Amino acid sequence: MSVVALIVGSLSKQSLNRHIAEQILKCAPENVQIEEIDISNLPLYSQDLDDINIPFYSRVREQIKGADAVLIASPEHNRTIPAALKNVIDIATRPHGQNVWLNKKVAIVTASPGVYGGINAGLDLRKVLTFVGAEVLAQPEVYLSKASFDLDERTTNFLKQFAQRFFQWVENK
């Protein structure tokens, strides 16, 4: 049994990226367990908190550590990573020497109703996650532009192909 953790970078209750992630996760094989990591209540990271047991921090670190892979679905805020998503990345690298991203398989999906499809956030995520030692899925890259909740056949097929590649990659431990 493989465990895939899902992190949605949007805090919106009607998140387009959550919808996209759900379409991908529908393709998960039966032997893959999906566990969403809720980032909505995480206090902002501060090094001053490294020596304090903060249950929200501990939970997130353990969920990432326990997963075989992480799927991140995120919008783009002001041409970069949403603050809540960057916060969880930072939390999971600390305290020093306890980086749970190290060698973790991570796939990135970004979507936006705009013309750029979240590519700036996707590239920044790739840069940050590579820096913290994650193994980021190289291909296929997913930057969905002009995205909406009503996915056309071409987009649906592309997401299915991405899902197939992602879950094969997860299974090759």
Predicted regions and their residues:
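N-terminal beta-loop-helix "entrance" segment that forms/cooperates
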Residues: 39-55, 148
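Short beta-strand/turn micro-motifs composed of small residues
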Residues: 8, 38, 110
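A general structural signal for well-ordered alpha-helical segments in protein cores
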Residues: 17, 21, 57, 85, ...
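Glycine-rich phosphate/pyrophosphate-binding loop and the adjoining helix
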Residues: 135-173
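Helix-loop-strand module that forms the ligand-binding subsite of alpha/beta enzymes
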Residues: 54-132
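Secondary-structure boundary/capping motif
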Residues: 13-16, 45, 80-81, 117-118
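N-terminal beta1-alpha1 ligand-phosphate binding loop
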Residues: 2-31
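A generic structural motif
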Residues: 29-35, 134-135
